[in-house]
Amino acid sequence: MSGGGGGGGSAPSRFADYFVICGLDTETGLEPDELSALCQYIQASKARDGASPFISSTTEGENFEQTPLRRTFKSKVLARYPENVDWNPFDQDAVGMLCMPKGLAFKTQADPREPQFHAFIITREDGSRTFGFALTFYEEVTSKQICSAMQTLYHMHNAEYDVLHAPLADGGDQSGMEDGEGIPGTKLQRFNSYDISRDTLYVSKCICLITPMSFMKACRSVLQQLHQAVTSPQPPPLPLESYIYNVLYEVPLPPPGRSLKFSGVYGPIICQRPSTNELPLFDFPVKEVFELLGVENVFQLFTCALLEFQILLYSQHYQRLMTVAETITALMFPFQWQHVYVPILPASLLHFLDAPVPYLMGLHSNGLDDRSKLELPQEANLCFVDVDNHFIELPEDLPQFPNKLEFVQEVSEILMAFGVPPEGNLHCSESASKLKRIRASELVSDKRNGNIAGSPLHSYELLKENETIARLQALVKRTGVSLEKLEVREDPSSNKDFKVQCDEEELRIYQLNIQIREVFANRFTQMFADYEVFVIQPSQDKESWFTNREQMQNFDKASFLSDQPEPYLPFLSRFLETQMFASFIDNKIMCHDDDDKDPVLRVFDSRVDKIRLLNVRTPTLRTSMYQKCTTVDEAEKAIELRLAKIDHTAVHPHLLDMKIGQGKYEPGFFPKLQSDVLCTGPASNKWTKRNAPAQWRRKDRQKQHTEHLRLDNDQREKYIQEARNMGSTIRQPKLSNLSPSVIAQTNWKFVEGLLKECRNKTKRMLVEKMGREAVELGHGEVNITGVEENTLIASLCDLLERIWSHGLQVKQGKSALWSHLLHYQENRQRKLTSGSLSTSGILLDSERRKSDASAVMSPLRISLIQDMRHIQNIGEIKTDVGKARAWVRLSMEKKLLSRHLKQLLSDHELTKKLYKRYAFLRCDDEKEQFLYHLLSFNAVDYFCFTNVFTTILIPYHILIVPSKKLGGSMFTANPWICISGELGETQILQIPRNVLEMTFECQNLGKLTTVQIGHDNSGLYAKWLVECVMVRNEVTGHTYKFPCGRWLGKGMDDGSLERVLVGELLTSLPEVDERPCRTPPLQQSPSVIRRLVTISPNNKPKLNTGQIQESIGEAVNGIVKHFHKPEKERGSLTLLLCGECGLVSALEQAFQHGFKSPRLFKNVFIWDFLEKAQTYYETLEQNDVVPEENWHTRARNFCRFVTAVNNTPRNIGKDGKFQMLVCLGARDHLLHHWIALLADCPITAHMYEDVALIKDHTLVNSLIRVLQTLQEFNITLDTSLVKGIDI
């Protein structure tokens, strides 16, 4: 609606604010359109960069490649009535541009001159809206000067054309034929020609209504009847001023829930406005959108809009652009599009397509150029919709809307019931080239794609052949809906108890509109039925909340997503990050009571309350079952009641107090109206005082009163928009003068907006990653989920693409970032070839050390080009956009994103060549701040490349570090190694003897978890003391250290020939290219201190019972926490079981406590004790001396597991066997049984001191209770831990 509350109480009472006439000003003559200056500027800059400019006159700004009849000329607002109203100031520039977006058009008697209607919206910078409705028709040009000027232009055009195309006969350059599509010159001159002696010249003129609300059908009817009065042979009953005066001053704006009838020139006009508890006013035909695009394309476009992609609609018809844009935004209820919204983009604002912000714009097509001729600045995040050719291009990685199949089916059933083919004209990108060869006129009756002209009945007969429709019909029949001829002549849902006062076709449009909208609204009501539970109300006052809004979390996204079904997550996780969702939640926080609520929010909340009441559901109880819409009948009935019983009939048009004889009627010409009677309304508002209370019911006075008191809400909205700008510094293009300074200022706002968005996005990602935000708000420890992380990274990639697309000289490829990288790579290779660049920075160190026992791995060189090559070698990535995103992910994982981009932008000559002066990447200060913000990502660890590209081949580099003092060079056995990760494990890799460093390639293993290392015990000296093993991912640079510090050899330590080592990721130092990987380990859990060399359990420092209890409690607590996290957040369970502070180590300390010291230098291990206990219980079983059945089962299980571990073919040693037994006991929930069994075993008395923990019944019972907490969890063991055992 129109914004502001200024202008007094009459502001909301009028149906229309202005009547406007636009057209040719015969006094100023023919002027080139406003685009000419801008075109010259753009084309001149392209010419400097080697692009081919169009040929234009430097003096006139005219394009001689186009015939004068095809050119557009400046239109002007010729008249407006009244001059101004306080509550809706007249915006002459905007109205002029949008009434005639391409300026004036000329035609001759040979051209079709049908009148064209279109609606438009003027969105102010504060987000408020005014609606316009324009009817464009053609009038004969009576001015001799204009006709002579057109004739002169044709002479100039023909002369210029002959000069330009003279070389064509000699086979010269043919670039000038672009507009003529290869037509010979003489033929082209006859086409669209004008001869003053034999042709009649016509020029476009536009009549327009500017209104506070979008009553499209009523305004169209008003304008069409006015035009009919002008073109009719007979004059209208009254002067035109009477009808225009009536609609401006005597037709009121219906209040919510009311209907209105008023008179046009030839017939009554009816409009109705939904009540405050219904869906908001929407007066465009949804049917047309589904017929033009088809259900599938509408859903894809709808999803793109919800995720705030850039959307560009493309059509020859302005009204189609408007209908599609308004329909898509209306279907979003209760969410509202928050970004640039220009459904009809005036030709003079084409530079706005360069905007690096989300937008929804409509671009007019001339009907001749196809998609390939459109040079769009950025396409990586663009949804392009060719409305006339029923074709849509989607951004990559578009997630599917939740329950899409059932949703599509429900919508299709409604469409079929109204005779609308649900399968529209669906085409995928592969058929784009074919589409370009099909003329739009041929598509009108193309039976193959479902775009059927004619009545619904004929459409139905033709669609019977269609397989998809047949399947949908079968689905509908199963639901009990009759499809006999689709009831095209009579609507089964119409109510026979009353007669509506509009024609049947109009009623069916109302019914289809409300049914489709109710179904879409129901989806959001079901999906967000519990949203209020997750809104975090601010604890501070409003002023503080506004000030710190960007640092606050106002919706518990992690908890909300954890409640959602898995298939919903890809869409919902991205949707929760959008501006429209943020604004929706802001509105919720600002509205403390129902009276204060935003009207849209009030309607949505009432529906949510109704659903909860009907389903008797609690906030935590949700279902993923698809629930159909049940509110259609009620909504339909409300509309039908308003149309059957009109609440008010406006005053009929009447003779005005005006001079007789002025405005002489002349068929075919819109008369000059008498401004003295149209510029002022009634002197005293008697009509309002007399009729308003009687006709509009009493409660509507309350409604008007609340509208006066809404200043507070306007202020609230202003605060919200300021607080949640999120980088969209400029929300709407100002439709005003287009001087270079204005364009420069607009671009500067874009630059500032991009920088702000970058700052907000990096901060959001860091806060989520570190989990600080939720902790500060008192929600405990919250980690980001994999889905959320992917969403935020995808959002960062979108931002980078928009930054790299801003101010491009010439678009090359769909990804501006990847295009820039390729240019940089090409430049570097050229310099390398010429020898002007050193190769040392990009070569990997391939040295192969044999016997150096240092724990230092040769550094991995930093190289932007090498990282590009890694991406280029991945065959699974086919597109430039995909490659750019993969490169960003890899750079983030390597903590090199800021550094790489700084290196990329350091080639200033390349940047100047690729970008215009105003581009973000050429604003030095902002660019530096941008790179600084990206540098903050180095503070956290991302695995966004490793976890996404799971099937690619990765080279891994291994370094084995033996003890410096013992057993290095004399080792004679043949070693082997096997590496395991979260995504898989390698086969056993044989290591050449005396080789300590090697590289191999295998499918991505993910984060590495364990290394199994061993040897075949061959040769004279088969004893090996290994300090640690290091493994590096050669693509991501992640280096893992697997400490060992134990012997591998018979008769040494516990006699093990192989060991399972649990690893940790080493963090990298800031200058990774200058320092080796001698780095501290990443902290895996609180108070973890890793020793460089692990020592055998017998020699570990002894802990007291309190410390042992604490370590077991912490180990078990770590496992419990692991399982309480969402599955995608969980770390390595292997580390929690077998790591330094894992369960195995803690239980090892418990069994070591009070263990009797061995004599005569003989080592005794815990496994020796367990074997003796097994022998004891087996003997008892043989003698049938078992106390009870329970005890018998536990003893038998214990013996079975110990025997199975002892019989494993692996040479894992006694400590390895103990580790395996503990892991198996944890998996099968038997540990607490075994502890109780061993505590009562007589063997314990022989092998343990009296002070031992295992002999203290109180401590044992406490230990059993702790271990029992693991019973509820399903523990899955890494295959490396239980390899070779089948139990």
Swiss-Prot record:
GO terms for molecular function: guanyl-nucleotide exchange factor activity; small GTPase binding. InterPro entries: cDENN_dom, dDENN_dom, DEN5A/B, DENN_C, PLAT/LH2_dom, PLAT/LH2_dom_sf, PLAT_RAB6IP1, RUN1_DENND5A. The keyword NAD does not apply. Residues 416-598 form the dDENN domain. Residues 278-414 form the cDENN domain. One of its GO terms (biological process) is retrograde transport, endosome to Golgi. The modification Phosphoserine is found at S193, S1085, S1087, S1096. The modification Phosphothreonine is found at T1079. The keyword Nucleotide-binding does not apply. Residues 57-259 form the uDENN domain. Residues 787-950, 1134-1280 form the RUN domain. Keywords: Golgi apparatus, Guanine-nucleotide releasing factor, Membrane, Phosphoprotein, Repeat. Residues 954-1062 form the PLAT domain. GO terms for cellular component: cytosol; Golgi apparatus; Golgi membrane; retromer complex; trans-Golgi network. It is found in: Golgi apparatus membrane. Interacts with RAB6A bound to GTP. Guanine nucleotide exchange factor (GEF) which may activate RAB6A and RAB39A and/or RAB39B. Promotes the exchange of GDP to GTP, converting inactive GDP-bound Rab proteins into their active GTP-bound form. Involved in the negative regulation of neurite outgrowth. Belongs to the RAB6IP1 family. This is DENN domain-containing protein 5A. It comes from Mus musculus. The lineage of its organism: Eukaryota, Metazoa, Chordata, Craniata, Vertebrata.
